[in-house]
């Protein structure tokens, strides 16, 4: 009896498989040898996982008696892994478009924050919003990210600060995890800012004594699934001591450490992350040489966010120094009311232009390395047999177009596939429905 499969993508000009030896991440040298197949095809099974990838003729011969739910002719096109966005803040109400003009006039991030804007403004509006309002806007944002090729996102809470609103946000993230196609890595970020009327010490005590026990109980009950814990380690927010206490308490209940550090001021956050065994530290615009060395030794990923440096006019993260030192460099969009970017292709473009990363380095950082930062490199980030069948098909004969083109990706990206199912297709896209490959 002929075997049945979910999807065949055939005759692609290029397939960027990224890795071929089950690597969990790529360092600088490995990035230069990014695995790209020419004139190839890819098969995804009914379980949503990749069954074969290789030369088109080989695949055609091997699967000559197989049937497929869908077949996509990728002649003249390229196939890439679904992009992984390793850092976003997508659940909130009340945009901050008015603050953009303030930044253009010279106000700094902390100027706005200390005046009651920034995170505090969003906390007020998010607290007032209903669960349904938050979910609808959140769903719309994730759908926009998916149309730009993202198939796995890290989603943070952090615009509640008080336990009730933080749990409301985590429930919204959990609903997305259960109902939407895009994969979600959930992050508790109750230490995103110090609530009004509290000191950092008091806020840390509240998180450790009240928030985390509630999270643990809800996780045990199956109400929510939280993967990571985040803290904004910054001058005027949570100092190094408070950050360490919160992270250690989170680690004690099974959460992965993945936090903001060394963004606006040098805080020794990278060193702390390495010491505590963090999966990742984000931002790192102000990281020290010692911090870079510590990240490399600990295999702690540096999640760099070129949109933030661009919008806030900060100095660029030291991507080249990190790569040379052996750091696992990842990328994220930092989507939030302060950095309104849905597109990982644009993030990769900025990483190349402003952080001096190469095209291959940027793609690896937005796929396998970003998956590593989220603890998902075994399922996402490359197109290897056994991994989840998440792919992006672009209408170009060279994969580099997805980074080279600055914007307009709604025309370039023909379709996005998650677990072998076509979850987005542009208006010009067509598929072949065939019972048998002949």
Curated annotation (Swiss-Prot):
It comes from the Eukaryota. Binds 1 zinc or iron ion per subunit. Signal peptide: none annotated. Its cofactor is Zn(2+); Fe(3+). Keywords: Histidine metabolism, Hydrolase, Iron, Metal-binding, Zinc. It holds the Pfam family Amidohydro_1. The keyword Cytoplasm does not apply. One of its GO terms (cellular component) is cytoplasm. The keyword Iron applies. Pathway: Amino-acid degradation; L-histidine degradation into L-glutamate; N-formimidoyl-L-glutamate from L-histidine: step 3/3. N-formimidoyl-L-glutamate binds at residues 159, 336. GO terms for molecular function: imidazolonepropionase activity; metal ion binding. Gene3D superfamilies: Metal-dependent hydrolases, Urease, subunit C, domain 1. One of its GO terms (biological process) is L-histidine catabolic process to glutamate and formate. Disulfide bonds: none annotated. Zn(2+) binds at residues 260, 334. Its EC number is 3.5.2.7. Belongs to the metallo-dependent hydrolases superfamily. HutI family. NCBIfam families: hutI. This is Probable imidazolonepropionase. It comes from Xenopus laevis. The gene is amdhd1.
